Amino acid sequence: MGKEKTHVNVVVIGHVDSGKSTTTGHLIYKCGGIDKRTIEEFEKEAAELGKGSFKYAWVLDKLKAERERGITIDIALWKFETPKYNVTVIDAPGHRDFIKNMITGTSQADCAILIIAGGTGEFEAGISKDGQTREHALLAFTLGFRQLIVAINKMDTTKWSQDRYNEIVKEVSGFIKKIGFNPKSVPFVPISGWHGDNMLDESTNMPWFKGWNKETKAGSKTGKTLLEAIDAIEPPVRPSDKPLRLPLQDVYKIGGIGTVPVGRVETGTIKAGMVVNFAPAAVTTEVKSVEMHHETLTEGLPGDNVGFNVKNVSVKDIRRGNVCSDSKNDPAKESASFTAQVIILNHPGQISAGYAPVLDCHTAHIACKFSELIEKIDRRSGKKMEDSPKFVKSGDSAIVKMVPSKPMCVEAYTDYPPLGRFAVRDMRQTVAVGVIKAVEKVDKAGKVTKAAAKASKK
């Protein structure tokens, strides 16, 4: 087995019919953690339902259905391997809450794979003003992604046309450049997620494709397939030396064990014996044990999805959206208010002070009021255009002061990136995205459990 491969997380984005499920399903199917027996069961079931031809997407549909029913499915099913990496697919899209998940979840992703349908009319629909392709790519950039792979899918439906491919590459390079990506650092790969061309093996149908190349500070890399492009992702730097921040996804009550909060370590490390604080709940207690995938860990590191057992804390005291931190090392606090730079993506009217939509920031989902519009700025240059604007509308970018309607814990993006970016949701869509510049924190005395008091004396 040798040394374990580095883990990387990818998110797959693109228009609804671009073939994301088929492409992702194909990778998971061919290089993934699904055992042969499960695959055979899937195939049999798909055939019985007359979905024989649909097996890759079907794999994903099965997994997704289980995930949505709340069955904690074996996360190995969402993994596949490249020569260098263990890859986890963070979100298989097509999910209603995909954009919300992107904001709350992609703090996790190291790279975005943008799937584009090459078919006539399909590409145009995806990239049109209201197509999802642009919105997803803009979100990815705003959320701090700098690594992008573009796969131009369904090349079989274009009769493997080089002209069509070149036309799409030119158009996509243009719009991702406008957003802020450097197209030179982005590999473009023509694929058929369905037939498997250029997925794992070089296609014989596109002899004209001489391969992708990407240039980054680390040097230039080339390859032929999507798998190679994923293998060429720059290895992520995990922020384990920062103080602990762990937003809770759920809190379980487990018989014989007690209260078990679950979440992903975003920064720092968590280990047994640590005295942790939950904000904004203001509860302090000792961590009894930390585990991942039912195995005890000596410490949870950034990127790990862990469950940890805490003493003398009831399930009613803490909840999803709370943030766990080390009580002795820059503990997290409740946020009274914060200033943020927001980009208005799509709002039918005008937004003025007093607007109070729901914010999704890490795992918190709380209404926040735009209490003051401080200044309007040019989205591309970041320069100030106007002080105290009366309103902002779609396409504008502004610095605003926000006040949460209920206790909430957020951080400045520069200190803790995953806790410093958010989506503004209203009318079932993402109205704006934002990055937090500064936070006004609340100091409040909270509940310190007996276990914490005892552990602190040690």
Curated annotation (Swiss-Prot):
A cellular-component GO term for this protein: cytoplasm
Record's subcellular location: Cytoplasm
N6,N6-dimethyllysine: residues carrying this PTM: 3, 316
Segments traversing the membrane: none
Main location: cytoplasm
Ranges where the record places region G4: 153-156
Pfam families: GTP-eEF1A_C, GTP_EFTU, GTP_EFTU_D2
Renumbered residue ranges of the record's region G1: 14-21
HAMAP family cross-referenced by the UniProt entry: EF_Tu_A
Listed name of the protein: Elongation factor 1-alpha
The organism's taxonomic lineage, starting at the top: Eukaryota, Fungi, Fungi incertae sedis, Mucoromycota, Mucoromycotina
Gene this protein is translated from: TEF-1
